[in-house]
Amino acid sequence: LVGSEMCIRDSWIGPVWDAAMFIVPMAIYHYYGDTRSIEKLWPVCTKYLAYLAGREDAEGTVTYGIGDWVFHKTQTPTEFTTTCYYYLDNLYMAKFAELIGKDGSSYAKKAEELKLLINHKYFDTSKAIYANGSQAAQGVALYLGIVPKEYEQQVADNLSTMIKANKNLLDFGVLGSKTVLRMLSKYGYADLAYQMAAQEEAPSWGNWIKQGFTTLAETWILSPKFRDASVNHMFLGDINAWMY
């Protein structure tokens, strides 16, 4: 939380969640052409990005946060997902500036620097694989436009290969649930995306239905000892938007 006179240092949730302050006003603008939310949030966004700049490590990455929350087996490195959304924040801030008549050159420059950093540190060009090779890492990099144009299809091809090797089962958390189906569809693997979406074997959306759930759970695997998470939680529900 960034206030006018104090700063509470976040050590848990992190920039992926905080990115809502950029994503929501951008969505409002795209749907309605209305910039009032951008104008209202501009001072907060300015302070927040200054705060994140102060949380960078020596390389320029931001390492805290919960990242691909409720992943199944493979955890995508938090420093990767956090820095990717730090890039998105700056990219959107530059666009906000353009829309409301502010100077966004520093944010555009920062976004480009972060994109270069992410690709230098986390992208293996010889294999066309991001980070630790997780499904979510490939989905996030493609969805946010971080992948160099000449490698986009290769990264998507590798994503499809990972999923097929995992019996068309998902292996991600909230960030993968937002990005993987969309990117499979975008790059020629809509049939594979559908097979993943229609799975009834756990972990899957279909497995919840098979078990009789009529609401979305907070985590993929449920048990009789399920006590610490919600069974009416929308954040793994982007599959609905993907369908339409």
In which residue ranges do the predicted regions lie?
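Short linear capping/connector segments at secondary-structure termini
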Residues: 4, 65-71, 126
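Short, small-residue-biased leader/transition segments that mark boundaries at the very start
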Residues: 1-8
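C-terminal capping/lid segments that line or modulate ligand- or cofactor-binding pockets
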Residues: 21-22, 28, 76-78, 82, ...
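Heptad-repeat amphipathic alpha-helical coiled-coil interaction surface used
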Residues: 29, 87, 93-94, 111
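Internal glycine-rich alpha/beta core junctions
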Residues: 50-53, 58-59, 144-147
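The substrate-binding groove and active-site-proximal loops of carbohydrate-active enzymes
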Residues: 9-14, 29-39, 70-82, 100
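Extended, well-ordered alpha-helical scaffold segments
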Residues: 4, 35-52, 93, 99-121, ...
